[in-house]
Structure formats: structure tokens, C-alpha cells
């Protein structure tokens, strides 16, 4: 396993397992499978409604808590200093843990400055080892950076071969903020798994499209959290540290970048309304 070092010295696995859209009843089994395969970074969120399943897996897996790296996120419905702090305590309870390794603001909406102050408080109290954000465009990230005491360690954003975030990554690096990908397979959009470029490169290395896509991001220093509910695919997604893409491979994959989201713009009024309606 490769690790990245965050801006406060905390080491984070570069490859993890994400539980977005994993049913609460399935989360425990999936996380136990992921941990048994070798995953140590587990990414969840308050809005996923499966923190309890993750917590059950943490309690049952037999792996020391110190060897796991648990990520969760504060949803806008819990924004604001007091409300966010209470929600952090609730997440800790659901996760059956004394601390969260990485806590993120999930969306750049609501009183996220109040939320960030609550996260800083939890950090100072030892309840959180690192704090950061998710879905923050560079302008919002820079503004936040200049107006908080504890600088954001991570920004989790849509990152895959069709939306590579190359320019955005430069800003994150400038502000010592680790880029973390959600949706590394673009949730299958753009006929992702049948992409001829990725198939061709995969054949050359005897690897799958998914493995090539993950390897591309890993070689760019991106943290990735692929999701699968199937144990064999979890194993395949872990099998990406025994080959290297060539410079030519990297340049070829870079040409797939459209520089546009395949999901929704965080500046789209209808999307903002949707996010703020979710509790």
C-alpha cells in the first residue's frame, strides 16, 4: 500500500474503499470484505446513512483501530458550529470509535465556516486527526484557506479520466491540500468500462480498464476510493501496485480529459436546491 502524508504529518493510505450508495444493511458486510482483502481506508458520510454499518465492521473486523483510516463527512443539513459539532459526536457514536481519521465538509453550502470551526474544535480535542473539504472548487478552497486556523488537509472532488482536475490539482498542491477522488470510474458514465484507450493500455499491461484508471490517478498522487459490493472486484481494485504506466500511457490517458463534470455543477441552482433539500 502507498501512503500520502497530509499537511499535519498524518499518513493516509492512497487507496481506500468507498461506501457511497452502499445500502445500510449491506455496509457492514461490504466493509468487512474490504478489510479482509486489505483495505484500511474506509470512506463514508453522514448522508450515506451507513455509518452504523461501517462502525459495526470496525468493531468486528479484528484489525486494530490504529491500523484503520476512517473518513466521514458533515452534511449541509448539519451546518453551523453547534449543530455540526453535535453531528460529529453522533458520527463518532455510530462509527463506534473515539476518533475519526479524516473529517470533511461534504458540500460547499450552508454555514460551512461554522461547520469548519466545529471541526477545528473536534481536531483540537483529539476527536479528529485531520480535517478538510469535499466538492470545493479552487476559488472556495482558497477563500477558506485564508480564513481558518487549521488549514484543510484534503479536498475530495470528482476525479476520473474524463474529468481529471489537472488545473485544480495544481491549486490544491499550492495550498498543501491533498486531492482525493470520488467516482474514479465515473460511475460507468461515458461507456467508461468499454473505453478503447483504456482497454488498449490495459491489454499491454495485462490489467483491466478499472485497474488502469486507478493506476493513472495513483501515479498522479491522487487518493482513490473505488466502490464495489463484490469481493472479487474489491480484490481487483487493490491489485494496482505491481505495474507502472509509462509516460506515453499517462499522456495518452490525459487526452481523455473533457475538463467537465459528468454529474452536476456545484454552481447549478437546481443542484444546490436538491442538496439543501436532503436531510
Language-model region placement:
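Short, acidic/polar
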Residues: 22-34, 79-95, 114, 139-141, ...
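Acidic-and-aromatic substrate-binding clefts and catalytic sites of carbohydrate-active enzymes
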Residues: 22-25, 45-53, 77-82, 108-113, ...
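CE4/NodB-like, metal-dependent polysaccharide N-deacetylase domain
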Residues: 7, 84-104, 121-125
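A structural motif
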Residues: 39, 97-100, 128, 152
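N-terminal binding-site loop/beta-alpha segment at the start of enzyme catalytic domains
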Residues: 1-68, 185, 279
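A short, structured active-site edge motif that brings together acidic residues
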Residues: 65-78, 101-108, 135
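Beta/alpha (TIM)-barrel catalytic core signal, keyed to glycine-rich beta->alpha loops juxtaposed to Asp/Glu
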Residues: 107-279
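Structural motif
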Residues: 33, 37, 94-95, 126, ...
